[in-house]
Amino acid sequence: SYDGGGDDGWFMGYKMDKVSPKDKQMKTILYSLLDVGNPYMYLGYFIHDINYVLDYGEACLVYAGKLMGLAGYGKVRDEWVEPLTDYYHKWNREGYNPVENNAPGYMEELGKKIGLSFVYCWDDMSEFYEHAHPEHRLKGDDAADLIATSQKVFEDLVFNEIKPFIDEYKTNVCLTGGCALNILLNSKIRKYVKKKYNKEVYVAPNSSDCGLATGLILDYVRPSTPPDLTYAGEDVIDKDMFFSYCDMKNQKYYNDPTELKTVADNLRSSKIYGLVQGTSEHGPRALGNRSLIG
């Protein structure tokens, strides 16, 4: 389990044994000070092609997925691997030590090592004071290559941390926590586990706080069969306002199935739709009852 932080740490490993008595089924085998989520997402502040998000808490939820996508457009620069590895290790922490307060220093040092400028706003009258300057962000190959190299460092750090335990226990693997939503890393781990030990890798999809609550309940109830929580989220909270929204925005409401052809034609014309139906997903999803299609 590795993510942006929890009550018991940032990077934890457990050995599960459901045959043992309940109080002995879970054994802690890894307690690491390694924090890979925050240094990974923090680089998003400096990438021009990613919409700027000022709030740190919101940025933690927004930047990571977009950075993973951007990594595919860049190339790993071998000479940047060591400086970025050093940058990641500066975020190592114990408990809630707010190392992110030192991020400007981390970025300045990284910039000197790799020859890039990470510009901050030091105007104390600006809302961006002490944050990345929104008008001076990285573009082009420098931006894409930085994120591609960061993705490699991220993968190497996590894989090297958990590989000894995979090799020792030779069993199925469960990945959880926000960082476990990085499908590039998940694929690397799954390929290794499957090829070397012919075991399976399960990635918990509900890595947000809803998963924590569910885990506590399931640990207490111990259901005999796995519950289907795919769409166990909230209903559309403002669905009663739909017609009012249409009137406010002067939008047309389609209620005849034959008019869906209009939607199809618009999609073929590269227009984008937001799809909202039923209850929401239990945890973050790229597609489902809350989707952007185009």
Question: What residue ranges belong to the model's regions?
Answer:
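A contiguous, well-structured pocket-lining segment that forms one wall/lid of small-molecule binding clefts
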Residues: 58-171, 184-192, 196, 225
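Hydrophobic alpha-helical scaffolding
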Residues: 29-33, 136, 140, 144, ...
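Short glycine-rich phosphate-binding loop at a beta-alpha junction
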Residues: 169-178, 274
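Flexible beta->alpha loop and helix N-cap segments adjacent to enzyme active/binding sites
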Residues: 1-91, 96, 181-182, 186-294
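Phosphate-binding glycine-rich loops and adjacent basic patches that engage nucleotide phosphates
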Residues: 2-5, 116-126, 176-179
